[in-house]
Amino acid sequence: MSRRCLVTGGGSGIGAGITRVLAGAGDRVAILGRRRAPLLATLAALPGRGRDCMALAADVTRKKSLAKAVATVGERFGGLDVVVANAGIGGPNGCALPGPDRWDEIVRTNLDGTFFTILAALPHLQDGGRIVVVSSVLGRFGVPGYTAYCASKHGLIGLVKALALELAPRGITVNAVCPGWVDTDMAKAGMELLAKGTKVSFRKARSRALAAVPIGRMLRPDEIGASVEWLCSPAAGGMTGQAISHCGGAVMW
């Protein structure tokens, strides 16, 4: 049976991978993002050019416009069965660099934006539905210089655990996927910053990063999509409040 799905940050990277997997399973998918062009490109690459899917430009940090976009999806689809809160940003932010504005931007997007997305979707989400939050392995441990990012991703796991209890009476499950290094533009930008900060080549920085990954490679966005799709399946109906590390073995707890 086709599911009605909402995916934020669906225009690139992990979000695009999630969209491909869900659409490939026969689901109707609505993708949201700040820029319309990447969203349309993602849909155009789907089987049938995403004829049963839709794209809407929306910023998860802007509650009113986000709620309007989600309501449009809910009305068009006649409700929602799946909400995937994937939109997020990365980059460095330590105690002193680059300052409180960057902290606010990262936490506002990653943590607040996820909460705003779920709040906007709940009136349209059917009982027995699924919520999947994309956190990170940096939600499981800390990294110096990435204070805001780590804090926001840790916060998402706490949000998942609390919401899982709040929404259990409706039969709605809430889980998180915590990716490690995934082959995306965001990950490449992170490795470039790592190379610059350690004064080594990009190739060397990439090699050092992947040395901490037992399988020795970056994951593909569609692999993360497969984890999300499973959490939305009947087989995962008994799982809620969990954070699954999908990271090639970099984290084993």
Question: Can you annotate each of these PLM segments?
Answer:
Residues 123, 165-166:
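Alpha-helical segment proximal to the catalytic Tyr-Lys
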Residues 141, 217, 228-229, 240-253:
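Short C-terminal tail/terminal secondary-structure segment
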Residues 11-13:
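Conserved glycine-rich cofactor-binding loop
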Residues 118, 152, 160:
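Active-site helix of classical SDR
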Residues 136:
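Residue(s) in the substrate-gating loop at a strand-loop-helix junction
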Residues 94-107, 209:
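Substrate-binding pocket helix/loop in short-chain dehydrogenase/reductase
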Residues 84, 168, 173, 239-241:
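Short, small/polar-rich loop/turn modules that mediate ligand/substrate recognition or access, typified
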